[in-house]
Amino acid sequence: MYTFEVFDSRTRSIVKLEDCLLRLYVCGITPYKSTHLGHAFTYVGFDTLFRLALDSGRDVLYIQNISDIDEPLFQYAEKVGIHYKDLARTQTKRFFEDMHTLECLPPGYVIPVSKVLDGIKTGIEGLISRNMAYKLPNGDVYFDSTLTDPGKMFCFDRKTAMSLMLETDTGKNPFDPLLWRGRGAEPQWEASFGAGRPAWHISCAVLSNLQTQYENVLHIYGGGRDLAFPHHEFTNVLSKLIRAPKDNKQQDTVQDVFMHTGLVSYMGDKMSKSKGNLVFISQLREQCEKIGLHHSVIRLALLQRHYREDWEWQDECLDRAASRFRLWKSALQEYIGAKGIRSTADQNKGTQGAWERIHGGVFDSNFDHRQPIHPKHSPQMRDYSEHGSAGQNGTDLDLSLYQAIRFHLCNDLDTPKALDAVDSYARKGTITIPEARAVEKLLGIPLTRV
């Protein structure tokens, strides 16, 4: 096992990941519209972390949620005249297809909010009983934010924190986040404190708080930088309070780290549904297919930016990635030709088969939030070991490219420098098959499958 370093957005410092269970919770989608580049940049970034952590020999508990109980989903379903459950299933399938396009590995657990409703109710009941949450006459339940210092976790002053609050409904205090929408809520579920449905922060708090039997746990909260406050702060506060002893003392052995990806702009503004300046992954895939490019070029275009960087998408981003991909592929073909090898193409479907396998069970399978969960990885990760798949039965040159990629990724996922390292080897004339497999395992670019 080897150590690596990441940047903690809360402490604004580098954290070294030692020997521990790595629990990675990345906020998933609200399944009502397709995946755009802003989403993709986040998921590719944390997929790279997932790959590196597995390669290092760690146990990794990677969880993503699906917000199938969420106001934007209900509103959009009503607007287009479709049942929200049908919309959630259809859009989740499309999201999985987009994740395959991006060559992302499926997390160990992809869990809809609807599967942990009982846990959410129990969590809210506990907060109410400890006078940490309160119910209004209209049925809404809010968390009492006076128990914390909103914005402090990420060094926002009160004025800035207030400007970032997304709550359209307020309780006794403008910083109090909604936990349970009681008034006029349809659909709704019964609870001891009144019928309604859960809100965003408490849902993620419960999902990120699923029990494990490990003692030494480092918990990474992942998402876009715009989630830091209020979402990640309140998710973390609620999570700690839910798992704290009933005497209200927050005795906790879990170390929390926050990693946030940069924001992607297009046409001068941050990509957002409200502004309509979105570039969808499905559109880029069609664009690649029309000109004979493999879809992994989209992932390569995203890896050209450091995960913490704010940047703007332009057509040149894809062109540059395509040139890079051709350079790498040509260098591999040079090696294949020199060795007289007929084909290196793997006969598997890569990440596609893995995403297809989990799709059917996401909404239909039973999930007991009370039972401890354990690390589990997709089938294509079976050959991960401390040395990865690169360098095994290869030459010193094979191993040194693997080491070069790993060196840069261990430095806070420095993908731009990792790509430069592959460029350097490709320009020397050849990329060997073991080197190409190192590129796939660590960077997710499948040179041997295209």
Swiss-Prot record:
Subcellular localization: Cytoplasm
Protein name from the UniProt record: Putative cysteine--tRNA ligase 2
PANTHER family xref list: CYSTEINE--TRNA LIGASE, CYTOPLASMIC, CYSTEINYL-TRNA SYNTHETASE
Catalyzed reactions: tRNA(Cys) + L-cysteine + ATP = L-cysteinyl-tRNA(Cys) + AMP + diphosphate
Region (Disordered): 372-392
Higher taxonomy: Bacteria, Bacillati, Actinomycetota, Actinomycetes, Micrococcales
Main location: cytoplasm
Residues spanned by motif 'KMSKS' region: 270-274
Superkingdom of this protein's organism: Bacteria
Binding site for ATP: K273
InterPro entries attached to this UniProt entry: Cys-tRNA/MSH_ligase, Rossmann-like_a/b/a_fold, tRNA-synt_1_cat_dom
UniProt keyword list: Aminoacyl-tRNA synthetase, ATP-binding, Cytoplasm, Ligase, Nucleotide-binding, Protein biosynthesis
Family to which this protein belongs: Belongs to the class-I aminoacyl-tRNA synthetase family.
One matching Pfam family: tRNA-synt_1e
Species name: Tropheryma whipplei (strain Twist)
Quaternary assembly: Monomer.
EC class (word): ligase
Gene Ontology MF terms: ATP binding; cysteine-tRNA ligase activity
Keyword Ligase: yes
Enzyme nomenclature, EC number: 6.1.1.16
GO BP terms: cysteinyl-tRNA aminoacylation
A Gene Ontology cellular-component term: cytosol
Short sequence motif 'HIGH' region: positions: 29-39
